[in-house]
C-alpha cells in the first residue's frame, strides 16, 4: 500500500515535466542522432584503416611467396588445382588417330621430350607449380616431366605440385603428361627412406633377388606403385633389368636382381606387375644391359664386349620377357656393343641396336626382341652422350636410331629446335615422328 502511494505521487510531476518541455525532448533526440553519426563515421574510418592494413599484409605475403617460390605466382596457382570431373562430362575422349590429326608438327615433336621442371621453366629449383609452370606448359607442352629429390619435399607439397601440373597439361593440350620419378627401391630412391614421407627404405634389389622369392619383388612394385599413385605420379624409371654378367661391375651391382637372365627376368617382371597394377608405367632399363660393363655411362664411354649370341642368351632375356609381360617402356642405355654393331656408337644412337634388334625389323626375327612399347633414351645429359654429341645432334640421332622419347637433353631448347629443323629439312620424316607419337598416345589414352 505504501509503495503504491509513492508510485502514484511520482506520476503527476513527470506528467507536468513532459507537458512543459517538448523542446528539450527534441534537443535530446538531436544529440543522440549526432552521436550516432559520429560513431558511424569513426567506425567507417576504422574499417578503412583495417582494410588498408590487410591489403599491406597481403602485398607483403605475396612478396614473401614470390621470394620462396621464384617464378611461380601462387595466387594464380590457387585456381582450382584438381581436374573437375564436371568439365569432362559429356565430352567424347579423343582417339589416338584423332589426336594425331589435330596436332601440329610442333606439338608432336614436343611430345617426344621428357625434361626436368627446371629445364621446362628456367627456374633454378622447382618445388611448386604456379603461373610460371602453366605458362611454360602452354608454350612447350612436352610429353613428360621427371622429378628428383630436390623437387620432392613432403607428401602434401608433391601432391599439390603434380595435381596442378597435370591440370595445366589437360587444360592446355587435352593430353596428360607422363609425370615420372626414379624410384627403384634400395640404392636408388627419391622418396622411400626419407623421414618427411614416412616410407621405410627397401632392401637393395640384389638382396631381393638373392631371396629366391619373386613374390618379394612384386611386393616392392606394389608398395612403390601405391605411394607413387597416391602422390600423383604415373611413371617410374624402374625396374633395373640388367643382368650382372660382369663381376667387376659396380654401376648396377646392388641394383640388379642377379647374374642369371631368367632369374632377373622373373623378378623384374614382378616389379612391373606391381607398379602397373596401380597405373604406374614401368620402365625396364638399361638395354642392352649395363651389367656387362665396367665403366659408368654417367661419366663417359661405357661398353659391353659381349656378342649378340651372348646378349640374346642372357642380357636380353629380361627385356624380351618384360616386353611380353606388358612393360610400357624400355630405356635404351648409352652403352656401346662393338661386337654387335662393329663400332663404338652407344646403343641409344644405334639403328642396329634399337630398330633392328630391340624393335625388330623383318629379316631379323631370329635375333630380335620385337618390342612394341615406348623406347625412351637414358638421360641425354650423361657423359657418354655429351662427350661426343651436341644436344641437337644427340636428339636427332636417337630418333633416327628408333627411340620414341628423349630424356633430359643437356640443352632442351637446342634439342627441340634441332628435331624440328631435322623434320623441316627432311633429315627426319614426319611419318617417323608420327610413329613415336602414336606409341606415346596409346599409353596415355590407355
Give the ranges of each region predicted by the language model:
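Non-catalytic positions within long, well-ordered alpha-helices that form the structural scaffold/packing
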Residues: 138, 229-230, 323, 399
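Active-site-proximal loop/short-helix segments
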Residues: 191-197, 234-254, 281, 285-302, ...
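Substrate-binding cleft of extracellular glycoside hydrolase catalytic domains
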Residues: 171, 177-221
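Hydrophobic faces of well-ordered beta-strands that scaffold small-molecule active sites
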Residues: 110-117, 143-147, 177-183, 235-239, ...
Amino acid at each position: 500500500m505504501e509503495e503504491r502511494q509513492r508510485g502514484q505521487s511520482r506520476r503527476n510531476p513527470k506528467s507536468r515535466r513532459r507537458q512543459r518541455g517538448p523542446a528539450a525532448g527534441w534537443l535530446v533526440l538531436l544529440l543522440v542522432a549526432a552521436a550516432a553519426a559520429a560513431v558511424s563515421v569513426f567506425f567507417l574510418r576504422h574499417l578503412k584503416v583495417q582494410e588498408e592494413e590487410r591489403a599491406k599484409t597481403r602485398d607483403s605475403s605475396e612478396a614473401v611467396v614470390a621470394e620462396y617460390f621464384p617464378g611461380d605466382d601462387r595466387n594464380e596457382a590457387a585456381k582450382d588445382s584438381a581436374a573437375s570431373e564436371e568439365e569432362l562430362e559429356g565430352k567424347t575422349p579423343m582417339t589416338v588417330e584423332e589426336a594425331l590429326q589435330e596436332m601440329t608438327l610442333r606439338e608432336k615433336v614436343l611430345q617426344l621430350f621428357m625434361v626436368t621442371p627446371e629445364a621446362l621453366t628456367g627456374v633454378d629449383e622447382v618445388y611448386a607449380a604456379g603461373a610460371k609452370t602453366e605458362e611454360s606448359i602452354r608454350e612447350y607442352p612436352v610429353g613428360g616431366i621427371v622429378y628428383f629429390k630436390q623437387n620432392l619435399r613432403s607428401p602434401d607439397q608433391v601432391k599439390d605440385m603434380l595435381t596442378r601440373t597435370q591440370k595445366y597439361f589437360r587444360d592446355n593440350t587435352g593430353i596428360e603428361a607422363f609425370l615420372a620419378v626414379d624410384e627403384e627401391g634400395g640404392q636408388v630412391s627419391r622418396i622411400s627412406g626419407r623421414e618427411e614421407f614416412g616410407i621405410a627404405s627397401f632392401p637393395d634389389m640384389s638382396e631381393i633377388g638373392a631371396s629366391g622369392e619373386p613374390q618379394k619383388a612384386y611386393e616392392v612394385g606394389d608398395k612403390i606403385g601405391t605411394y607413387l599413385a597416391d602422390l600423383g605420379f604415373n611413371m617410374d624409371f624402374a625396374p633395373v633389368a640388367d643382368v650382372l654378367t660382369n663381376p667387376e661391375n659396380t654401376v648396377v651391382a646392388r641394383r640388379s636382381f642377379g647374374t642369371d637372365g631368367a632369374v632377373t627376368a622373373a623378378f623384374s617382371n614382378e616389379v612391373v606387375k606391381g607398379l602397373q597394377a596401380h597405373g604406374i608405367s614401368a620402365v625396364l632399363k638399361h638395354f642392352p644391359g649395363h651389367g656387362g660393363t665396367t665403366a659408368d655411362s654417367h661419366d663417359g664411354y661405357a661398353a659391353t664386349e659381349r656378342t649378340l649370341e651372348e646378349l640374346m642368351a642372357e642380357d636380353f632375356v629380361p627385356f624380351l620377357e618384360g616386353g611380353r609381360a606388358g612393360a610400357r617402356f624400355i630405356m635404351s642405355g648409352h652403352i656401346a656393343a662393338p661386337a654387335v654393331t662393329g663400332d663404338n656408337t652407344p646403343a641409344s644412337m644405334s639403328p642396329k641396336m634399337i630398330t633392328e634388334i630391340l624393335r625388330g625389323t623383318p629379316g631379323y626375327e631370329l635375333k630380335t626382341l620385337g618390342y612394341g612399347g615406348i623406347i625412351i633414351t637414358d638421360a641425354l645429359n650423361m657423359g657418354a652422350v655429351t662427350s661426343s654429341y651436341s644436344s641437337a645432334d644427340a636428339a636427332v640421332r636417337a630418333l633416327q636410331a628408333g627411340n620414341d622419347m628423349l630424356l633430359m637433353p643437356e640443352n632442351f631448347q637446342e634439342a627441340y629446335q634441332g628435331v624440328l629443323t631435322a623434320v623441316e629439312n627432311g633429315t627426319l620424316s614426319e611419318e617417323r615422328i608420327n610413329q613415336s607419337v602414336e606409341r606415346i598416345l596409346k599409353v596415355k589414352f590407355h
